[in-house]
Amino acid sequence: MKRTHILPGGQLTLSIDRADLPPDELFALGARANPRRAFLFVSKVLGKHWPVTTATLARIHQMLAAKLPAALPAPVLFIGMAETATALAQGVFEAWLAQHPQQEALYLHTSRLRVAGAAVLPFEESHSHAAQQWLHLPIDAENRRRFSTARSLVLIDDELSTGNTFRALAAALTPHLPALQETHWLCLTDFSPPTSAAPPCHSLLRGQWHYRASGKAPLTPPVRERAITIADSGHGRLGIRHALQLSEACFADSTIKAGERVLVLGSGEYLHPPAVYARELAQRCGADIYLQSSTRSPALVWGAISHKRRFADPYDAGVPYYLYNVPPDHRYDHIHICHEHPANTALRESAAALSAKLIQLT
């Protein structure tokens, strides 16, 4: 299947070679204010720019986990990429654990933020609007053991364009993984060029794209991010060996009724704990729960993006965040904004603007 799309800044030709699901179920097209790449594939199954149900999330996680070889040498190290793929990757990790309960494994995700007291491996994401990110090295003794003795490495992102980010991360990891035998790449959509040098790549869709700019792409003004450190919340930056469980206190004050429409919002890269919260909420109250997140991604109002608003920087790092496709006339009965640290002024203001409830997950 081959289609050509006219975007605000140019022309995109998209060829789909293989798809496990109809492409229209996986993504739609958007445009963004980024001269490195002026378009984006707006995922319909991630819970970032587009709301997704918890049932859809679970289905996608299980499909991707099942694509990995059945007999990966253990310990298996799973790494998810910030900002966009943190919930996808941790969901895949948990689905894989359920499929292989006897295997030793460890999950980590990269971060745009520094955790206080933890050593990091820096690397760059070449096409991103926020190129710098870090992988934190585990502190817990058992997590360190599984990390340093890992024999299989699984790198997970939502989309693969060139493979350069995975290569940069793998190069940074090489001195720390002396026992490594196998590497696998896992993603929703694989648009990387075919190369014999790449590890096995498992995806739900394989294709190619070619973009021809027709003029200068809109440019987002550069942001001077403040150098801050955060406390670790124990949800993945420093490693986790099991499926995430939230405390009962997170659900103690719920007044949601069966049949109501509820939007659960994550904050930037903090999305998997809100996904777990959304799943638990759906099971407990029988409401129609949708998941989405604020994001640093500077998209334009075009195509799959029908509405855009500035949103809280939950970490006070001076970074603009955005929330997409939640217009003033939205049809949700409740909105819950989930966050990992005590709410700052910006989060309280965003909650007030949406008449939303703030939930600190523990």
Where do the PLM segments sit?
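PRPP-associated nucleotide enzymes
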Residues: 1-362
